[in-house]
């Protein structure tokens, strides 16, 4: 039987989380999604270290092996603007190369839904680049509903699909 677990990331996880984020970045680039940067950009260990120290970053383990990561926040004014405290926001959902197709994405999002529910909030929210049709379809297959779009104000900025799903 396969064991899946989620725990809070620590400084000791930085190297493997950097690898996982870069694996996910490469997959996005392969689908012409440059929201995390173009080919060769990737994530540095310093960026991941800062993320781990400043946010709620989690490690997903499959049979004790780090296989995924994500961050969880209680607000996201950048993409969603000011909101009532009714949701939890997921960012950086990433699966390590070789671990795709094992249900880790849905496992992470179900875990987030349980956390949101435990905080007496109603929705799990996330965003993704609108032009990454495969990723948008994946989230929709998990029951997420696109409730809006957010265009970055920068010239040539991305347009983001804003998704939410009831946490119950």
Positions of PLM-derived features:
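Conserved acetyl-CoA binding element of GNAT-fold acetyltransferases
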Residues: 81-97
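A short helix-loop-beta-strand connector motif used in the catalytic cores of GNAT acetyltransferases and
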Residues: 46-59, 89
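C-terminal "cap" of GNAT-fold acetyltransferases
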Residues: 129-133, 141-142, 148-168
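Conserved acetyl-CoA-binding loop-helix of GNAT-fold acetyltransferases
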Residues: 95, 101-114, 137-141
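Conserved GNAT acetyl-CoA-binding A-motif
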Residues: 116-127
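A short beta-loop-alpha structural element at the N-terminal edge
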Residues: 5-19
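Conserved beta-strand in the GNAT
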Residues: 59, 65-74, 89, 94
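Conserved GNAT-fold acetyl-CoA-binding loop/helix
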Residues: 22-47
């Amino acid at each position: 039987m396969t064991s899946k677990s989620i725990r809070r990331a620590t400084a000791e996880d930085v190297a493997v989380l950097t690898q996982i984020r870069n694996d996910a970045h490469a997959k996005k680039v392969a689908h012409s999604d440059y929201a995390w940067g173009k080919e060769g950009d990737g994530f540095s260990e310093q960026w991941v270290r800062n993320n781990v120290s400043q946010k709620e970053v989690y490690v997903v383990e499959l049979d004790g092996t780090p296989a995924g990561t994500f961050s969880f926040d209680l607000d996201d004014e950048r993409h969603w603007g000011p909101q009532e405290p009714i949701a939890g926001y997921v960012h950086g959902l990433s699966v390590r190369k070789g671990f795709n197709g094992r249900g880790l994405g849905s496992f992470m999002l179900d875990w987030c839904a349980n956390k949101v529910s435990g905080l007496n909030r109603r929705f799990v929210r996330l965003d993704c680049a609108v032009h990454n049709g495969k990723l948008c379809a994946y989230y929709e297959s998990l029951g997420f509903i696109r409730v809006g779009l957010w265009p970055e104000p920068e010239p040539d900025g991305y347009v983001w699909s804003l998704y939410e799903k009831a946490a119950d």
